[in-house]
Amino acid sequence: MEKIRDTRWDVLKGLLILCVLYRHFLVYGSSISYIASKTVANFVHVFTMPLFVFVSGYFTKHVDETKRYWFGILGVFETYAVYQIFKGLLYHYSIWQLISFPALMMWYLLALVIWKIVYFCLNKMKIKVNGILITLLVLIALAVGFVPFIGETFALSRIFYFAPYFFLGIMLQNIKVIDEIKLRLKVPLAWLILIVALICSIMASVYNGFYIVDGVFQGNEPYPEEEKWIYMGLRFFSYLVSFIVSISVVRLFVNTNRTLEIVGKDSLKFYIFHGFGLMAFGILPIPWKYGLAGLRHNSFANHILLQQDQAF
């Protein structure tokens, strides 16, 4: 018998997707020049993608259902491929760009495909997802920063950086994570953690550290040549900060909320299509002379999405 879904997970996804959308409006809009906007963008970035990746791992289907498992992987890849190809046509991507550089927001779908395939292989090799594996993944993520060619190409750096969160979600599938957090973490401590994180975000914004924080918590580039060890330390620190802030967010804000629950159930669609919202507000350029192609792109991708299980 399939276990009853805890709707608080949908509330969490709804909260996260709204944070992601708001952050993208800040980052890609002109308001990012203001201290307040930078502060919010930095603060939100600390927990949104780590929690999204964790939730994706937490709800990853069991490999024992091989046909259904691969159908889910192909569904995610199909959605990724449709967007990548059509956006490539709209913006005149070269073949190399089309293959090697995921379009804005699409890197996550490519990462999901890779992580799910890796999990399938680990399962077939009888390798358990446990604390040792998570530690190894963190060490690998720290190490790849020293490799100059592992960066935004194929989103490899991000795939390595966020992998520990995905497999941590898989490892904790049999634990009622939300209940455990609410039981063990006291509300005053959770508020203190978030206040300290917010103060640090303000300081980073005031002292022009926005892009340093942004880069560290995205993990999308190799370490700067002259400061490799410093940035490795920052990357390790980012894992600790994201973990602590994330559980605090869950403790304080993940409760019953019908509106967020509704949004959370369609989080993948919001994630993929909010690019059109950015275009509508003039934050991202609209290829007007390819408008009809854009409409076909939107309709076809939506048709694909409606046929697939949600990846989030």
Where does each model-flagged region fall?
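Alpha-helical transmembrane segments and their immediate juxtamembrane cytosolic regions
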Residues: 1-312
